[in-house]
Regions:
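Surface-exposed loop/turn and secondary-structure junction residues enriched for glycine/proline
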Residues: 19, 115, 119, 123-124, ...
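GIY-YIG nuclease catalytic motif and its immediate N-terminal context
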Residues: 1-111, 149-163
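Surface-exposed polar/charged interaction patches
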Residues: 19-22, 26, 122, 136-139
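C-terminal or late-domain output modules
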Residues: 126-178
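GIY-YIG-like beta-to-alpha core
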Residues: 69, 100-135
Length: 178
């Protein structure tokens, strides 16, 4: 019986991997901490996977220079050990070129609007794990892009983490827990 279940599970993983390869993010908006009016909060009361990209501001000639400057800002001592995700060196190594948009963070949520709100507005002192972008004075002038994949699913807790991992391995966001 266990072997039969294991074989079915292996087949499902294969099908989910193939499904994840077909998924495309829908761009929702660009925003900055100085202008959050572009975020359509009411349209984000959905479940699925979200991606936050950061815009390359054109001041750097290559990715290593850009990431070194970004790392200095992100890892500033005032923001360390504050329940925020870290820069992932193994994912940075997957980026060779400086693109217009750099994948910053990838996550999943049963209510994307609430989770994005936390990533932006959660205070640095709070223990909720989030980007806490608004609290970071040294990156307030950056431009971000929010994209989503809406996935309504009664088996969310089983399926979405697997799909999220596949997308994370494909996109390699530079910040995260994994």
């Amino acid at each position: 019986m266990f072997e039969e279940i294991n074989n079915k599970f292996t087949q499902l993983k294969t099908e989910l991997s193939e499904f994840a390869e077909t998924l495309e993010f829908t761009e929702i908006c660009e925003f900055s901490m100085n202008d959050l009016s572009q975020i359509p909060w009411d349209n984000l009361n959905i479940s699925g996977i979200y991606k936050i990209d950061i815009k390359n501001n054109g001041l750097y000639s290559d990715f290593p220079n850009w990431i070194n400057t970004f790392r200095e800002k992100w890892e500033d001592l005032q923001y360390k050990r504050k329940f925020v995700p870290n820069i992932k060196t193994k994912r940075i190594k997957m980026h060779n070129e400086l693109q217009e948009w750099i994948p910053l963070y990838l996550g999943k949520s049963k209510k994307i609007s609430s989770r994005i709100h936390q990533h932006i507005f959660k205070e640095m002192e709070k223990t909720t794990f989030a980007l806490k972008l608004y609290a970071r004075e040294n990156i307030k002038d950056e431009t971000y892009k929010l994209s989503i994949i809406e996935i309504q699913n009664e088996n969310y807790d089983f399926i979405i983490p697997f799909v999220e991992k596949k997308l994370r391995d494909k996109i390699n966001p530079i910040i995260g827990k994994q």
